[in-house]
Amino acid sequence: MMQELKQSYIKTFDKDDVALSTNDLSVLYGGKVQKLFDASLQFKKNTITALIGASGSGKSTFLRSLNRMNDKVATVNGEIWFHGLDVNKPNINVYELRKSIGMVFQRPNPFPKSIRENIVYALKANGKTDKQELDKIVEESLRAAALWDEVKDKLDKSALALSGGQQQRLCIARALAVQPQILLLDEPASALDPVSTSKLEDTLKQLRSKYTMVMVTHNMQQASRISDYTAFFHLGHVIEYNSTAEIFTNPKGKITEDYIQGSFG
């Protein structure tokens, strides 16, 4: 098994092209159960990177560590580099960090408020009160999430009345409202029907020109359709990281090939 866990290939980029990177990132739960081992990855600006692997492979643990979502439940060792700072240091303000590195979760989680209030809630909490400015951000965020045309006449209606797919795009709009540079997505389409999934994928592809995105997915077809790069995780290790085209058509490692072909996982 140790032979299988050797890395096959880990792609790197020119320093100026990197939006976010990790160095020897490891995660332990309860101080003794290690779920991630020495993960070192670079994420290229304005691309979508898919994290794939079987359940329990460490991909979601890795993703949630990137903006310190695991702080209260796990010990995270190693480095996370963003704008020249190791943001895994204890002196980092994690709330400010999460404005720059946003998160969209597996299931839509709109606030039990109006569509408008879902977008402006965090902005108001951070001192923005000008109605004209807030209205502008609401429209821009909903347009970016490809939701504006569907909800522009019912912004004061409950967000809970939206369909599942609309709710997930609202959650993306809510994350975009605070102007992040990076968007983390943990299986964002897993609870959606095929039509809603297609709309969500189109939205993510449009956002790529402005944001860097890292997405966990169990859907191999989805990874191949919308991602530029793919990282394959297995038993807490990053086994292979390359362009999505290479991962799916010419994987370097046998274990990667087996997973892509559905031989395990």
From Swiss-Prot:
<dbReference type="GO" id="GO:0005886">
    <property type="term" value="C:plasma membrane"/>
</dbReference>
<feature type="domain" description="ABC transporter">
    <location>
        <begin position="20"/>
        <end position="260"/>
    </location>
</feature>
<protein>
    <recommendedName>
        <fullName>Phosphate import ATP-binding protein PstB 1</fullName>
        <ecNumber>7.3.2.1</ecNumber>
    </recommendedName>
</protein>
<comment type="function">
    <text>Part of the ABC transporter complex PstSACB involved in phosphate import. Responsible for energy coupling to the transport system.</text>
</comment>
<keyword id="KW-0813">Transport</keyword>
<comment type="subunit">
    <text>The complex is composed of two ATP-binding proteins (PstB), two transmembrane proteins (PstC and PstA) and a solute-binding protein (PstS).</text>
</comment>
<dbReference type="InterPro" id="IPR027417">
    <property type="entry name" value="P-loop_NTPase"/>
</dbReference>
<dbReference type="GO" id="GO:0015415">
    <property type="term" value="F:ATPase-coupled phosphate ion transmembrane transporter activity"/>
</dbReference>
<keyword id="KW-0067">ATP-binding</keyword>
<dbReference type="InterPro" id="IPR005670">
    <property type="entry name" value="PstB-like"/>
</dbReference>
<feature type="binding site">
    <location>
        <begin position="53"/>
        <end position="60"/>
    </location>
    <ligand>
        <name>ATP</name>
    </ligand>
</feature>
<dbReference type="GO" id="GO:0005524">
    <property type="term" value="F:ATP binding"/>
</dbReference>
<keyword id="KW-1003">Cell membrane</keyword>
<dbReference type="GO" id="GO:0035435">
    <property type="term" value="P:phosphate ion transmembrane transport"/>
</dbReference>
<dbReference type="InterPro" id="IPR017871">
    <property type="entry name" value="ABC_transporter-like_CS"/>
</dbReference>
<keyword id="KW-1278">Translocase</keyword>
<dbReference type="GO" id="GO:0016887">
    <property type="term" value="F:ATP hydrolysis activity"/>
</dbReference>
<dbReference type="InterPro" id="IPR003439">
    <property type="entry name" value="ABC_transporter-like_ATP-bd"/>
</dbReference>
<dbReference type="Pfam" id="PF00005">
    <property type="entry name" value="ABC_tran"/>
</dbReference>
<keyword id="KW-0592">Phosphate transport</keyword>
<keyword id="KW-0472">Membrane</keyword>
<dbReference type="InterPro" id="IPR003593">
    <property type="entry name" value="AAA+_ATPase"/>
</dbReference>
<comment type="similarity">
    <text>Belongs to the ABC transporter superfamily. Phosphate importer (TC 3.A.1.7) family.</text>
</comment>
<keyword id="KW-0547">Nucleotide-binding</keyword>
